[in-house]
């Protein structure tokens, strides 16, 4: 007679788990449940933000794909400018971008100046909130769009509110709309690898006293919970040349980050009509890392004297692309954001 093999409790647990996993896969498809070691996509895929400092603060080199990002702040702080830079970076990588303009305020000429290929960008100007979010849902489900920007949450007015009288109150209607939309969108976004960016405004809480910030974002709490990244954008300084204002100094803070450590900050210049000054970032980060030397008001890169005053150096580097690219290459190598360029001799030695 053959002896019946007895299983240890641990083996019985494994067999029960394997049976459950095979049942789940038959019912819901392959990949419904997996070990992290089985997943080939554990590294976070990103879309660069267009700002070296912001990419560094985000910890992964950009905004994550397959997740929701919220950019919020006061008016004219640079929220839409940042989102347009992200669209431009996505298009540089050969991706497809969509802009849902709920505010009906997108400046196409400004977008072009930031590097956005407006002829290739999908744009929608919906009439009400449900339409905007349905369009976003369908674009995400198509698996053919890399980034979707919704500008802004405050402009996503529920249809019931639009059809009501002007003085009629609709308590919590926008929060309910956003809560339902986020429950529906989040799973689809993750599967599609689309990066969805919500631009939001801030409001003052009524009757807030004592502890806590008096500011809050529109659209309820659902967006805060479902976001993987929340970026707070603030204008901290007005840039002037004598009496002429030519831009703003902006501080961004990563107040929530599920893909890297949060609460990192970055500062950079946003110039009117030009967007984020990448050249200005090269100067600031170059001085911070020691790649660009600063003595008084004079700047130097190695033996090359760049000029006196940041604005003069910025203009000089914009004209001298070879020198600007050399500084950028060295800075990105130092920050670990780009592989070092090998010389011909080093390449021959490796071969």
From Swiss-Prot:
Major localisation: cytoplasm
Example of a GO MF term: ATP-dependent DNA damage sensor activity
Compartments reported by the entry: Cytoplasm
Signal sequence interval, chain numbering: none
Tagged with keyword Membrane: no
HAMAP family in alphabetical order: RecA (MF_00268)
Name by which UniProt lists this protein: Protein RecA
